[in-house]
Amino acid sequence: MSKIRIIGLFLMLMLLLPLHAQEIIRGHVVDEATGEGIGFASVQYKGLNLVAITDPQGYFTIRLLKGKRLTVSVLGYKTRTVDVDGDSEKLFVSLRQDAKALKEVTVNKKRTRYSRKNNPAVELMKRVVANKKRTNLALRDYYQYTKYQKLTLALNDVDPEMLENPRFSKMPWLLEQVEVSQLTNKLILPLSVDETVTQKVYRRSPHDEKSIVKGMRSSGINDFFQTGEILNTMTKDIFTDINIYDDQVRILQHPFLSPIADGAISFYRYYIEDTLLVERDSCIHLHFLPNNQQDFGFRGDLYVLKDSSCQVKRCELILPNQTDVNFVENMKLVQEFTQLPTGEWVLSVDDMIVEMVLFDFFQKGVAIKTTRLSDYAFDEIPKQLFRGKAKSAIDPDAEMQDDTFWQQHRKVQLTKSEESMGDFLNGMQSMGGFKYVLTALKLLAENYIETGQKSKVDIGPVTSMLSNNFIDGLRTRFGGQTTANLSRHLFWKGYIARGWKSKNTYYSGEMTWSLNRKKYTPDEFPKRNISILSTYDVMSPSDKFLSSDKDNVFSSWKWAKVDKMMFYKRQKLTFEREEPWGLRTMFSAKTEENESAGNMQYFKFRTTELRAEIEYSPGALYVNSKMRRHKVNREAPIITLSHTYGIEGLLGGDYTYHYTEASVFKRFWFGSWGRIDLYTRAGVQWNQVPFPLLCMPASNLSYFSHKHMFNLINNMEFMNDRFVSVDFNWDMQGKIFNRIPLIRRLHWREYIGAKMLWGALSDKNNPYLQQNSDSKVLIAFPEQTRLMNPDIPYWEISLGIRSIFRFFQVEYVRRMNYNDNRIGPKNSVRLGFTLMF
């Protein structure tokens, strides 16, 4: 949901601009002599960065730009230029073979297939790959450099006719913000600009490297949102820095194979185009493209020095139009390498432009990232710069640098619109009705209602104000939380709720003291929090597995009747600490009274427990919303271990018990075959306890998908005191659908999944055994609860489609066994919202 809310930031200005549908050219490129379709031909508007590649049958689609000229070219054919007018929606282009280009090859009836054998382009690329180590700065004992980066987000391809609309004559601040992009020659309207100056330091032995942020500042529409850093953080993770000398290039939250990776020769096709000068260096120009245009790979050009070093001087990477990447209309990356006076070749220019479109009838967006690397040095670096295990650090004065600092370090000047961003924001605020639009979008993006310009108390979550359950019927809830505008260290959040059927009143209050200063919420990374909680409420036993609020209105729609519930009174003291390098520790003390409710029967009991948890997730990156924290970089593994000790007699605790749990999450990428997410969880209850303290399956009773939960296991259907669960999900990124002609146009993504639960109940926790008939601890299991066969794990499988209308997902789930006397359905459907590239 966090990604979906980010789109809301762009929608804010889109709502103010007239929407216009795009016209599309659907064309076919054929051989003039044979009439056969010509695959992998380049179709490009002259002078514009708008490119399409024909599919193997010669078909292509590209936006219709009236009055422009379309250039069609492919190796072995003469280039042809076509004028585009209003009648060009269906375009037929025939190309004539270039006799000069074919003079040195034998012409057969069928065109010659691409061959890697005896191919001079392939032989050159083998030398480029073999010489990669020469550019690897990590072989040096030390190195450091300064990186200046500017990231601009803007509305793209603004219609000039739209700006002539009389309604805009009253908005001079809007017209003045529109400018021509030097990269695409299109009209753009910058919405935000983010600048960062970073010092990168590296030491070979003992190995360490750090990024130290020396200066950072941001201005734009994200300033209107208290959690506006989500936009910048997510954008930087999506459009991350790359190095083509790495085998895998991660961008758009996907790994792409670099054109000079060790395995690139089998994935890409290479063609030598020409020999030319790049600046003053003689270079061989190579063109490359993926074997299959639908796979996640680049198309582009390499300029390799014409000497024994085979050093890449310049590279241009373009995402083929046929690549099944959502929301991206065009993407181009440019990297340039410079030779230092000492002889080393280093990256000096790293630019990226990504043109995006949410839907064809929405205004387009563009992200422009400009990066300059300079001040390379290889001298010994002081040890104090490597203190601590964190890979990144921010200087205390980074956000307070003056204009002198930026004039010194800004390697690329701001455009006129970027410099006047403050005037643009002031103009927006002065516009009639803007306050109401902003309030609505804040509600969509943040799920809380602010009580002032610098809100000290936020009201919400809004989606939890109305819900229903078996005990309460209609349930209303009013809650809120304080912000750092009231105190940088002390925070409170809570709610009061009313069940209109039960006539019960519920409450929750939590006070948090943060040992480090916060910008807005206490959950900001890294946590150094001490919290005390007091709650009285009603819940289903399966609610404890939900990652969202149990009162969320969307979670109230369930496929099973949840009539077995419990009242609980909970007091809890928690200390949580996070380290910048990925370690999280948590210690808590809790006392809780439980009483059965609805159709679940057991006597009231109390537990008192101490709990310790440790989690390690190296490289994890987080963003904060007002509700919770979201992990951005899902490539980071997560390893968690916890132990709970129940103490009889302490604060009225009725039982002594030990419960241990461990879990591991890891994502694996398989190139064009997509990714596999694997989550494994295991737990053991070591002592004899009543069934509410046993291991229950993580049951998802909602029609909406929830990660790492079983879709077709009912509430408390199985009882175990030891278990292992596995959640396997393979997202194939359209690998199959992209090869089905009609479905390919829908840009759907297929995925398959399987969930397994192995469980066992030891004799000491089985209330139905004769040996336990006199036990004062065990309680009879609820009706319809049963035991698992330790030799037969439970299985359910799923087949799903994501990216339906780019947002929605539908998943078919099937229960494979334990179908005798089952309570729920054997087959069902789950819905979800997923925003992915």
Report residues per predicted region.
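Structured extracytoplasmic
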Residues: 111-283, 289-297, 359-460, 464-467, ...
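Exposed, low-structure sequence patches enriched in small/polar residues
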Residues: 9, 254-256, 388-837
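Short Pro-Gly-centered beta-turn/loop motif in secreted/extracellular proteins
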Residues: 35-39, 61-68
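A short, amphipathic beta-strand motif
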Residues: 25-31, 58, 93
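Short, acidic Ser/Thr/Gly-rich low-complexity loop/linker segments typical of extracellular
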Residues: 49-59
